[in-house]
């Protein structure tokens, strides 16, 4: 939890309202320029420029650290998931990035939500030889996808029944049922969810971020406190945009707005009014 959500913070701080994105071809020559473009993508989707943006990030060395690159992973995952018919073409055009950055393609496909994401990864496995093991781990379930985020909650009666049934089965078979692989809700995952939201404008990522809000009051777990506070801050910074997004259900929009507090927006000079 030592890192700062720098890419995500920059994406918010460097941009004005999404509606202000200019009509001319965007500048994608620097990391800051790409962040601005990602932040305004929902106002004017331009999927054809996504590969160029990723190639720029790779050339500038912005993809070396998986933690600080999480917002890019989420963005590419959201794009691939939104355009299943173009997935192969998009990946083809992103592949020329540095071989050491191919991890981003693998994770983005695994996080995309495509029904056939495993087939897509296997199709391109030979083109990413240094990521064969990573691909194998994702496709066999040894690494979690974005759908496997772990949110602790009190077990329901059905959960308890399933647990009891599994325990009885383990007793008679002598084999312990393996626990499903879960994705811990960290600040890296938070960045990834925001990247997915920037690409799609869908409320699914926001709903998951809202699940992290209670952690902002957890004084017993420093990691959760950090993630919860980051979730609260980023939600507050984006609260004004909810009024312009019809894809966010009323109950989520209300929760999102209620998370906005003026003191939180003072960090990094951000304003919830935009």
Protein language model features and the residues they cover:
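Non-catalytic all-alpha helical scaffold/repeat segments
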Residues: 21-274
């Amino acid at each position: 939890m030592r890192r700062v959500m720098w890419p995500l913070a920059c994406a918010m701080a460097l941009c004005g309202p999404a509606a202000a994105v200019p009509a001319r071809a965007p500048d994608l020559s620097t990391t800051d320029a790409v962040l601005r473009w990602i932040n305004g993508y929902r106002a004017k989707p331009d999927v054809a420029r996504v590969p160029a943006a990723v190639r720029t990030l790779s050339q500038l060395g912005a993809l070396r650290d998986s933690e600080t690159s999480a917002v890019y992973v989420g963005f590419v995952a959201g794009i691939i998931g939104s355009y299943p018919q173009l997935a192969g073409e998009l990946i083809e055009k992103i592949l020329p990035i540095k071989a050491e950055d191919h991890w981003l393609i693998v994770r983005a496909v695994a996080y995309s939500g495509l029904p056939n994401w495993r087939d897509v990864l296997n199709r391109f496995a030979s083109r990413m030889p240094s990521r064969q093991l990573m691909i194998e781990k994702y496709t066999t379930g040894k690494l979690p996808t974005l759908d496997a985020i772990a949110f602790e909650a009190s077990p329901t009666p059905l959960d308890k029944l399933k647990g009891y049934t599994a325990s009885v089965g383990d007793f008679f078979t002598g084999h312990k049922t393996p626990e499903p692989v879960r994705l811990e809700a960290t600040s890296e995952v938070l960045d990834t969810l925001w990247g997915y939201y920037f690409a799609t404008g869908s409320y699914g990522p926001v709903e998951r971020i809202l699940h992290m809000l209670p952690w902002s009051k957890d004084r017993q777990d420093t990691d959760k406190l950090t993630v919860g506070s980051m979730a609260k801050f980023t939600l507050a910074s984006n609260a004004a945009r909810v009024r312009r997004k019809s894809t966010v259900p009323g109950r989520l929009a209300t929760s999102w707005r209620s998370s906005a507090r003026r003191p939180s927006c003072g960090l990094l000079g951000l304003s919830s009014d935009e």
